[in-house]
Amino acid sequence: MAAAPGGSAQPAGPGPRLGFSTADSGVGMSGLNPGPAVPMKDHDAIKLFVGQIPRGLDEQDLKPLFEEFGRIYELTVLKDRLTGLHKGCAFLTYCARDSALKAQSALHEQKTLPGMNRPIQVKPAASEGRGEDRKLFVGMLGKQQGEEDVRRLFQPFGHIEECTVLRSPDGTSKGCAFVKFGSQGEAQAAIRGLHGSRTMAGASSSLVVKLADTDRERALRRMQQMAGHLGAFHPAPLPLGACGAYTTAILQHQAALLAAAQGPGLGPVAAVAAQMQHVAAFSLVAAPLLPAAAANSPPGSGPGTLPGLPAPIGVNGFGPLTPQTNGQPGSDTLYNNGLSPYPAQSPGVADPLQQAYAGMHHYAAAYPSAYAPVSTAFPQQPSALPQQQREGPEGCNLFIYHLPQEFGDAELIQTFLPFGAVVSAKVFVDRATNQSKCFGFVSFDNPTSAQTAIQAMNGFQIGMKRLKVQLKRPKDANRPY
């Protein structure tokens, strides 16, 4: 190492590779011979995901490709933890934010590396939020306010990268705008400082400042609106994040119903029927109670006792569970708080409460946190169904192509649930990059739902592409689509 005039150490030979592990960097063995200085990066530097890399290229091979856009802070090729094999992708961080933007603009889907069939992917890593945590939606603006007025309003909270007032085709303001800050902290400060803080001139209510919807949320909302316009989508779906809280509320309400059941004129079956109204929020549809069940109900609990009570509810698309061998309903544990079980039902009739909750087990695998309370309270009886991807009957399985890159299994299920009971839904993912292949399969339990979904969603445009929705080909065909 040779000392430069300014006192900083300069390497005597070839410089060390940047962005590799400490072992690669060659840490000094003594205080007289310190290791190379660690490169500094901007506080708002962007971590890039690089995909479609030949598996024969390592960090040293990739470095010349990216160095022309700026100094590299870190470059790491992803490898399988168990096998150590190259995954065909990497993470890249430049010292300067501008360097990352230049590299993304020049390389993303612009150049195909030797041996690859698709162009290289260079885009912000998922952990960076793609700027979604910095972009704000501003509502309830005055119609007279333009971009400069909005900038002055938000300027005290940090550096504004973008500011756009949404306008109608005639140029008049829609009373809302998008504002993008340089960092997440600045965006959060603006939300805390401005949301609901004032009412702008000409606005009907206080100012709205919140994070803008993500691409995934916008695409999903557009699909659901499309389904609603065609009459296939009636009640709005319960947001996935709210399911856990809602199921907890159901179980709490159940306790109140059981207490009420001790009063005169309200038997266990009537209490179950009342409770079923709240289960309807989970896409369950009304079905009449079988006469055999009413015949076996204890005195005072028949339909005539409460003439205005709605009929109990069955499960959309799923049949009743097989009753237990002792003839008692599967939910008899509900009546252990001072209540005697009513007489055994006929062998062909399942308890309505157990029947209603049965369908939730089909979704418990997809949303374990949401349905955990229900699964615990109502254990599922043994099922002969396999756990792998299931298909519906012939004519009920759909192939969907041109899905948004951000869509996963959960979004696919929620998109096609409006058309009927979904048996299974799967988005195919590249094993090497863990990125969506933008196609998948959805299976319904009946051909009518499948045909309705095709009519509603085939050709539906998202961005620059249109969805392709068609029946999956038979298994003996060469291709499934």
Swiss-Prot record:
Domain RRM: start-end pairs: 46-127, 134-214, 396-474
Select a single GO molecular function from the record's annotations and give it.
mRNA binding
Its GO biological process terms? mRNA splice site recognition; regulation of alternative mRNA splicing, via spliceosome
Q: Where is this region: Disordered?
A: 1-34
GO cellular component terms listed in the entry, alphabetical order = cytoplasm; nucleus; ribonucleoprotein complex
**Record's InterPro entries?**
CELF3/4/5/6_RRM1, Nucleotide-bd_a/b_plait_sf, RBD_domain_sf, RRM_dom
Main subcellular localisation: nucleus
Cellular location of this protein?
A: Nucleus; Cytoplasm
Superkingdom of this protein's organism: Eukaryota
Its tissue distribution reads: Expressed mainly in kidney, brain and testis and present in other tissues albeit at lower levels. Also expressed in fetal kidney.
Biased region (Low complexity) positions are 1-12
Keywords from the named record = Cytoplasm, mRNA processing, Nucleus, Repeat, RNA-binding
Q: What does this protein do?
A: RNA-binding protein implicated in the regulation of pre-mRNA alternative splicing. Mediates exon inclusion and/or exclusion in pre-mRNA that are subject to tissue-specific and developmentally regulated alternative splicing. Specifically activates exon 5 inclusion of TNNT2 in a muscle-specific splicing enhancer (MSE)-dependent manner. Promotes also exon exclusion of INSR pre-mRNA.
Concerning its family, UniProt says:
Belongs to the CELF/BRUNOL family.
Q: What protein name is recorded for this chain?
A: CUGBP Elav-like family member 6
Q: Which organism is it from?
A: Homo sapiens (Human)
Gene symbol here is CELF6
